[in-house]
């Protein structure tokens, strides 16, 4: 049976390709989605790709993933540093989780160096640009196989 991975993107990631190109690059979120879909076919997994600017919607996505997905890849963006609700949802569903960030959160502003959600993650991929999504897919495939 084909494994299913949920990819969740948090606030402002819908603006990829438009905002702070020096940090986030020129690739749009739609291009990231297409790249993930292509790579998912190559490694024989199914993905569902979501983006929301609303914390509660992200929590609901996570809660609904139990029984429907084998793992979660999450770029919680700004909620990484603030959302106990997202952390609690990830801990509650007990699915393998990979936290991802386009930039290296550890060489940015001090407040970005603290990830609340990492406590629920099997691993963290950060600082590799949008290529990190492909790295996360490969890593998740290994975890859930």
Regions found by a protein language model. Name each.
Residues 91-107:
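Short, acidic/small-residue loops that bind anionic groups at enzyme active sites
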Residues 11-13, 77-80, 103-105:
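Short glycine-rich anion-binding loops that position phosphate/pyrophosphate groups of nucleotides
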Residues 49, 107-145:
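Short, glycine-/small-residue-rich phosphate/pyrophosphate-handling segment
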Residues 16-30:
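Glycine- and acidic-residue-enriched helix-capping/strand-helix junction motifs
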Residues 65-72:
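Short acidic/histidine-rich motifs immediately flanking catalytic phosphotransfer sites
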Residues 1-5:
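Extreme N-terminal starter segment of soluble prokaryotic enzymes
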Residues 46-56:
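Short beta->alpha junction loops
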Residues 64, 83-93:
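Short Gly/Thr/Asp-enriched flexible loops that form oxyanion-binding sites at enzyme active sites
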